[in-house]
Amino acid sequence: MKQGIHPKYREVVFQDISSDFAFITRSTVRTNETIQWEDGKEYPLFKVEVSSKSHPFYTGKQRALSSGGRVDQFQKKFGISTGN
């Protein structure tokens, strides 16, 4: 392997800012922030907006969108008839 061309692979804390959930994993992500983890060590911190703890698919708090209503709105807006 060539020296100096590979990103630094290290342990990083990912923090979900919407649900105050954090987990530690290995990553090459770059960040300037750090946080003290539960084990007392300091790790780089990367903040994410959505994780499995806050995403509607994983939390079961999904809402179904009615595509039929959107089609009807479009047809009304542009005066398109169904031609039946």
UniProtKB/Swiss-Prot annotation:
UniProt key word Ribosomal protein: yes
GO cellular component: ribonucleoprotein complex; ribosome
The keyword Iron appears for this protein: no
GO terms classed as biological process: translation
GO molecular function: structural constituent of ribosome
Record keywords: Ribonucleoprotein, Ribosomal protein
Coiled coil: none
InterPro entries from the UniProt entry: Ribosomal_bL28/bL31-like_sf, Ribosomal_bL31, Ribosomal_bL31_B, Ribosomal_bL31_sf
Top-rank lineage group of the source organism: Bacteria
Matching SUPFAM superfamilies: L28p-like
Oligomeric and partner information: Part of the 50S ribosomal subunit.
Annotated family: Belongs to the bacterial ribosomal protein bL31 family. Type B subfamily.
Name of protein: Large ribosomal subunit protein bL31B
